[in-house]
Amino acid sequence: MPERPPLAYLAIGVLSWPLVRFAYRLRWSGLENVPRTGGFVLAANHTSNFDPWPLGMPLFPRRWLRFMAKSELYWRPLRYVLDAGGAFPVQRGGGDVEAIRTAVELVRGGHVVVMFPEGTRRVKGLRKRWAARPHTGAARIAREAGAPLIPAAIEGTDRLSRLGPLRVAYGPPIEVTDDSAETTTRLMAEIRRLHETL
């Protein structure tokens, strides 16, 4: 069993809930695909730094989500917010071995580790969606931890100034094989399919 989330994490969730659920009109589907217990990897598309909130709110407070955050975000005072929110740092571009090891240990310990295979935000009008080559970290972590790989899609976080609506869809587990690249290809295809339903 994973340790209980810190009070700061719970406080962030409680304070965020009215904003995300009602002001931004968050709606979700596919929650039945998300394991209620045990660790797993949750992989989604990435369009905004706000993505963790709508992705995690439907699972709050019964699941404590842990996020990989790029190391350059870890400056004071933001690092305290990231730590309280369950994040841990990763060096982008070099395949951070320590971050992967930490993620595997967290999943084995019963945590939910959130991954964005695109590796960076895809903003409409700035960069064509789905064009970048995805990273295989989510598939590798799920394989090494022997845990489910759950796809998810997020829509609306690139239009926050309009106050929603925000949509999230969770899909059934992706079969994880020894070929992380092939697993990632199927993962991204499912994320894209889910996104088209939003």
List each model region and its residues:
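Residues at the C-termini of beta-strands that transition into short coil/loop
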Residues: 32, 71, 91, 153, ...
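A conditional alpha-helix N-cap/helix-loop micro-motif detector
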Residues: 24, 93-97, 131
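A secondary-structure boundary/capping signal
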Residues: 30, 69-70, 86, 116-118, ...
